[in-house]
Amino acid sequence: MAPTEITFVTGNANKLKEVQMLLAAEDKKGSITLKNEPLDLDELQDVDLKAIALTKCKQAVKELGVGTPVFVEDTALTFDEFNGLPGAYIKWFLKSMSLEKIVKLLEPYSNKGAEAITTIAYCDENGEYHIFQGITKGKIVDSRGPTNFGWDSIFEPLEGKGMTYAEMEKDFKNTLSHRGKAFVEFKKFLYA
């Protein structure tokens, strides 16, 4: 049975809105209340996305207390040509350089392949940890669409009808995005 309240730890308002949409889509009865805690968690510097999310979730549990169902979500953007980098470091790339400069990193290479990956780490009311992951393959393109949500305007998913995430309607994006896929798995677990 799904818990009645789950705490999502994030300080990212766009991410929070998207997660609210993703959870509400399945929860027709309103049986789960999503609470937000914008805790400032340390981020493990690693290329192992599951380890990063799990470490953040353990920190959140330490701050909020065992017994509170809590989850964190970490997103990565990996370039095939760079053997998985920038990966989880994409957040720092975005803070230090423009989207245009990120695209230029791949300019010398013909392979513009990329993967968008979301990893969810969840701790249930019994203190047990669970990991869920969603991956969407795509490519890096020149920026198209609004630039107000991370790197959405430079990632074009293979099954995205030639559009970047930023050019898509939210409902369509959520059916094929890395975050949408991760939340499908998370919701299956919650409602099992």
UniProtKB/Swiss-Prot annotation:
<dbReference type="GO" id="GO:0036219">
    <property type="term" value="F:GTP diphosphatase activity"/>
</dbReference>
<dbReference type="GO" id="GO:0047840">
    <property type="term" value="F:dCTP diphosphatase activity"/>
</dbReference>
<feature type="binding site">
    <location>
        <begin position="10"/>
        <end position="15"/>
    </location>
    <ligand>
        <name>ITP</name>
    </ligand>
</feature>
<feature type="binding site">
    <location>
        <begin position="149"/>
        <end position="152"/>
    </location>
    <ligand>
        <name>ITP</name>
    </ligand>
</feature>
<dbReference type="GO" id="GO:0009117">
    <property type="term" value="P:nucleotide metabolic process"/>
</dbReference>
<dbReference type="GO" id="GO:0035870">
    <property type="term" value="F:dITP diphosphatase activity"/>
</dbReference>
<dbReference type="GO" id="GO:0036221">
    <property type="term" value="F:UTP diphosphatase activity"/>
</dbReference>
<feature type="binding site">
    <location>
        <begin position="74"/>
        <end position="75"/>
    </location>
    <ligand>
        <name>ITP</name>
    </ligand>
</feature>
<keyword id="KW-0539">Nucleus</keyword>
<dbReference type="GO" id="GO:0000166">
    <property type="term" value="F:nucleotide binding"/>
</dbReference>
<dbReference type="GO" id="GO:0036222">
    <property type="term" value="F:XTP diphosphatase activity"/>
</dbReference>
<feature type="binding site">
    <location>
        <begin position="178"/>
        <end position="179"/>
    </location>
    <ligand>
        <name>ITP</name>
    </ligand>
</feature>
<keyword id="KW-0378">Hydrolase</keyword>
<comment type="subunit">
    <text>Homodimer.</text>
</comment>
<comment type="similarity">
    <text>Belongs to the HAM1 NTPase family.</text>
</comment>
<dbReference type="GO" id="GO:0036220">
    <property type="term" value="F:ITP diphosphatase activity"/>
</dbReference>
<keyword id="KW-0460">Magnesium</keyword>
<dbReference type="InterPro" id="IPR029001">
    <property type="entry name" value="ITPase-like_fam"/>
</dbReference>
<keyword id="KW-0479">Metal-binding</keyword>
<dbReference type="GO" id="GO:0005634">
    <property type="term" value="C:nucleus"/>
</dbReference>
<comment type="function">
    <text>Pyrophosphatase that hydrolyzes non-canonical purine nucleotides such as inosine triphosphate (ITP), deoxyinosine triphosphate (dITP) or xanthosine 5'-triphosphate (XTP) to their respective monophosphate derivatives. The enzyme does not distinguish between the deoxy- and ribose forms. Probably excludes non-canonical purines from RNA and DNA precursor pools, thus preventing their incorporation into RNA and DNA and avoiding chromosomal lesions.</text>
</comment>
<dbReference type="GO" id="GO:0046872">
    <property type="term" value="F:metal ion binding"/>
</dbReference>
<feature type="binding site">
    <location>
        <position position="91"/>
    </location>
    <ligand>
        <name>ITP</name>
    </ligand>
</feature>
<dbReference type="GO" id="GO:0036217">
    <property type="term" value="F:dGTP diphosphatase activity"/>
</dbReference>
<dbReference type="GO" id="GO:0008828">
    <property type="term" value="F:dATP diphosphatase activity"/>
</dbReference>
<dbReference type="InterPro" id="IPR027502">
    <property type="entry name" value="ITPase"/>
</dbReference>
<feature type="binding site">
    <location>
        <position position="173"/>
    </location>
    <ligand>
        <name>ITP</name>
    </ligand>
</feature>
<keyword id="KW-0547">Nucleotide-binding</keyword>
<feature type="binding site">
    <location>
        <position position="56"/>
    </location>
    <ligand>
        <name>ITP</name>
    </ligand>
</feature>
<dbReference type="GO" id="GO:0036218">
    <property type="term" value="F:dTTP diphosphatase activity"/>
</dbReference>
<keyword id="KW-0963">Cytoplasm</keyword>
<dbReference type="GO" id="GO:0009213">
    <property type="term" value="P:pyrimidine deoxyribonucleoside triphosphate catabolic process"/>
</dbReference>
<keyword id="KW-0464">Manganese</keyword>
<dbReference type="GO" id="GO:0005737">
    <property type="term" value="C:cytoplasm"/>
</dbReference>
<keyword id="KW-0546">Nucleotide metabolism</keyword>
<dbReference type="InterPro" id="IPR002637">
    <property type="entry name" value="RdgB/HAM1"/>
</dbReference>
<feature type="binding site">
    <location>
        <position position="43"/>
    </location>
    <ligand>
        <name>Mg(2+)</name>
    </ligand>
</feature>
<protein>
    <recommendedName>
        <fullName>Inosine triphosphate pyrophosphatase</fullName>
        <ecNumber>3.6.1.66</ecNumber>
    </recommendedName>
</protein>
<dbReference type="Pfam" id="PF01725">
    <property type="entry name" value="Ham1p_like"/>
</dbReference>
<dbReference type="GO" id="GO:0004170">
    <property type="term" value="F:dUTP diphosphatase activity"/>
</dbReference>
<dbReference type="GO" id="GO:0009217">
    <property type="term" value="P:purine deoxyribonucleoside triphosphate catabolic process"/>
</dbReference>
